[in-house]
Amino acid sequence: SSDKQEGKSTIVANMALSMAQLGKKTMLIALNLRRPTIYKMFGLSREAGLTDILMGNAKWQEVKKTSLDLLVGGLNVDSLLQMPGIDNLNIITCGRPVDNVSEILNSKALDQLFSELKKEYDIIIVDCSPVMAVPDAVTLSDKVDGVILVYKVGQTSKDVLKMAKTNLIKANANLLGVVLNNIKSEAQVGYSAYYYRYYADSSEKKGSIIDKWRGQLGGDKSS
């Protein structure tokens, strides 16, 4: 995203769940080290995680979170059991807080981690800090295969979005496109509306990302 509070982390989490549901072996990496939220969404502990890996204190195979970690974590077990494809999703949380975020993101250890994960997973999805807030996203942009911007309609100015795009292009990022968040639709019908609601209503709110998915997938039998 260009700025904070655009629903970026929620959309990233939804994308990871979508890929897992489609049968893709998916790794979600929490690389927003300054304001991490992914671990909270999935009811996980932030430690041990990415920073522990990059500082040489742990191996990714040891700290990756699986469906078992989700089951024993803070999420509703019934919701998890009704979540299709959850076994295909692994998560690397942010890890312990660090002061040298920029140094860590520029490290060869991160390059090595990406290289190893590409051999093991069908898709790797990364959540990182907003482009205009700190240099983290620009730093990471040439380390990944593609970048997607999240733009919250009505909150962030188009000028800021344009500057974010310019900064990424200058860094040789492969900009794949923009997800428009907070769009309201008068007619939300059927399968297409299911996806539309995700991206229209996503915001970084408290609560379980799994429970929100369960409602969208028809897991809530109250209606």
Please report, for each region that a protein language model flagged, where it lies by residue.
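P-loop NTP-binding module
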Residues: 1-223
